[in-house]
Amino acid sequence: MKKFLYTMIAGASLALAACNSQPQSTDMASQKKDIGLQLYSIRQLIGNAETFATNGDSILARLAGMGYTCVEAANYGNGKLYGMDPEAYKACVEKAGLKSLSTHTTRGLSEEELKAGAASEETMKWWDECIAAHKAAGVEYIVTPWQNLPKTLEELKLWCEYHNAIGKKCAEAGIKYGYHNHAHEFKKVEDQVMLAYMIENTDPQYVFFELDVYWTVMGQASPVEYFKKYPGRFKLLHIKDHKEIGQSGMVGFDAIFKNAEVAGVEHIIVEAEAYECADMMDGVKLCADYLLNADFVKACYSK
């Protein structure tokens, strides 16, 4: 515990020092890497329709200037992203020199559907509209960001069948479908670890996993062990730390990236939920700088 606290304090001190230091001049051309940002990381700035309309152009341009190449959306509803028609969202992102790569959105199964043992026709129609909107937005990956811990293994099996059905619909539209973990997926449902069961009971043809490396560590599991046990299942990675990336010492990023090929990684996406930096855009830049300057991070992972 003392070692953990020391590491956290030391990491926080380094992050604060980096936030307060003068920006270093870097040759972005020589350090160009394919790095995405989950826009939830800056939700206070462009987290909804109103703030995106006000700040979207300037914030996205700043992200491109930091070295980010693509974004993952986190605000979809009623056929729109951040209150915009899909085509308008795509144009806004591309105007900044970024790519509309992926999104976090989902519709869960209701208690009635769980009791019935199947998703309703209304739910699957919702997915048809969702997929069509994201196709128009140029999105390549749709990711379900959350699912509660099921009460029984039978319920978890139903969720896996649901993910397969969504994934099949996405595949028919030329979009890849995945699931993003937090820490609770490493708990057991009856005698099965939730995430392991999900990986083993979803069709690789239709469902991939976006492993959040920080939440995996917080769930007392090893990202690298999951890569080796389930090779090729992790097309996206959420690169996350306690705060700014690389500052806590909690996550073994070098080993994670050295095993990215085994995992099947196609893109890496930064997500930050809290910052040492007073200005979150400074924190987002620190995350990009860490990855741009890390020798163990390749320029591109997509095939």
Regions found by a protein language model. Give the residues of each.
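Bacterial N-terminal signal peptides
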Residues: 7-15
